[in-house]
């Protein structure tokens, strides 16, 4: 039996397993119940009890060797059949282009905004996107019946009519409240971040967008300081030729309040469909911080005054890159985004 085992091992070594037919022939010869290895197992009962354990171990090793040889050959044939094993390479072909990533247009604009305001002496403050009702509305002088506090305009997480109601912040103004509660004047900060509004998605509006707000609190701060800050920002952001106008407006947290427009990027102020024939596009809202807001943050309005402003980063990106649909900024279409890489 010893010679027979050795002979079968040599047959296994010499077997050419280079096709599916030969692989099947190997299986039929060595691995089936009527194969040569199985026949040797049947002959074990003819051996003496002394020799039977030794040859049983040898046969088990032979069987495992045959099975492993079969499995390895089967894997190689599967790889070749799928084409993964082919090594045909034309080394004369040019290499594939390596695409490099770039900053998203919104992040580019936000980065430029930060640099402009940092050069003016502003620091950066951030806060939670899941905010308390009291920080988002009450401390900002919003009356209890203000439309913004309705479920149709704000994403409420919990709404029990209490100060501890949770919501997705509708602006980054709560960050200003947190700063005024934690720090003493003078305060000069910008607050960038995501905000959420329960709005219908369209070419001009989205349910989530990026906002940057600014706050300056000190003694004898005036509206002239606010205008100088906005003018300086706009000239650096949109170019020295841009024209601005301030329009009276209303916000609960500022008094007086204004909205700021710049000349339309598409028509240069002549009037077109983007600016609705007005020649102007709104870029931000601003005003002097309301005395009630200062009092809510334990700041004496008789001693200190300040201004605040807020702008949509996404809308500014639309203006800068002449994009006419805000939804394009959120679709992550690389073909569109790579046009604005720098």
Curated annotation (Swiss-Prot):
| Residues reported in the UniProt entry to bind Mg(2+) | 255
Q: Name one GO molecular function term.
A: ATP binding
UniProt organism field: Chlorobium phaeobacteroides (strain BS1)
What's the name of the protein? Phenylalanine--tRNA ligase alpha subunit
Recorded E.C. number(s)? Answer: 6.1.1.20
The record's top EC class is ligase
Q: Which HAMAP family match?
A: Phe_tRNA_synth_alpha1 (MF_00281)
Taxonomic lineage of this organism? Answer: Bacteria, Pseudomonadati, Chlorobiota, Chlorobiia, Chlorobiales
Q: How is the cofactor bound?
A: Binds 2 magnesium ions per tetramer.
Which Gene Ontology CC terms are recorded?
A: cytoplasm
Tell me the GO BP annotations in alphabetical order. Answer: phenylalanyl-tRNA aminoacylation
Identify which cofactors the protein needs according to its UniProt entry: Mg(2+)
Q: Is Signal given among the entry's keywords?
A: no
Q: Which reaction does it catalyse?
A: tRNA(Phe) + L-phenylalanine + ATP = L-phenylalanyl-tRNA(Phe) + AMP + diphosphate + H(+)
Q: Where in the cell is it found?
A: Cytoplasm
């Amino acid at each position: 039996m010893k010679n027979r085992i050795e002979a079968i091992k040599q047959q296994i070594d010499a077997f050419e397993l280079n096709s599916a037919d030969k692989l099947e022939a190997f299986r039929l010869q060595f691995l089936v119940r009527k194969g040569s290895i199985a026949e040797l197992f049947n002959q074990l009962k003819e051996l003496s009890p002394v020799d039977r354990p030794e040859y049983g171990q040898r046969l088990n090793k032979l069987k495992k060797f045959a099975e492993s040889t079969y499995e390895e050959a089967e894997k190689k044939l599967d790889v070749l059949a799928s084409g993964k094993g082919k090594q045909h390479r034309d080394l004369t072909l040019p290499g594939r282009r390596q695409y490099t990533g770039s900053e998203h247009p919104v992040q580019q604009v936000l980065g430029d905004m930060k640099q402009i305001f940092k050069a003016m002496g502003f620091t950066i403050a951030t806060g939670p996107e899941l905010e308390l009702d009291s920080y988002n509305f009450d401390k900002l002088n919003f009356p209890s019946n203000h439309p913004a506090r309705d479920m149709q305009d704000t994403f409420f997480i919990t709404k029990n009519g209490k100060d501890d109601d949770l919501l997705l912040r509708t602006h980054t103004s709560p960050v200003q409240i947190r700063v005024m509660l934690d720090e003493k004047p003078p305060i000069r900060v910008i607050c960038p971040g995501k905000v959420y509004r329960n709005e219908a998605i369209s070419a001009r509006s989205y349910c989530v967008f990026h906002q940057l707000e600014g706050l300056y609190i000190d003694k004898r701060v005036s509206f002239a300081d606010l205008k100088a800050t906005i003018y300086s920002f706009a000239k650096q952001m949109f170019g020295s030729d841009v024209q601005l106008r301030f329009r009276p407006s209303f916000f609960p947290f500022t008094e007086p309040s204004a909205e700021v427009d710049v000349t339309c990027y598409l028509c240069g102020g002549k009037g077109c469909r983007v600016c609705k024939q007005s020649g102007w596009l709104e870029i931000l809202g601003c005003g002097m911080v309301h005395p009630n807001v200062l009092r809510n943050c334990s700041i004496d309005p008789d001693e200190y005054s300040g201004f605040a402003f807020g702008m949509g980063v996404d809308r500014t990106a639309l203006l800068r890159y002449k994009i006419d649909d805000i939804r394009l900024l959120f679709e992550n279409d690389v073909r569109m985004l790579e046009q604005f890489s720098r």
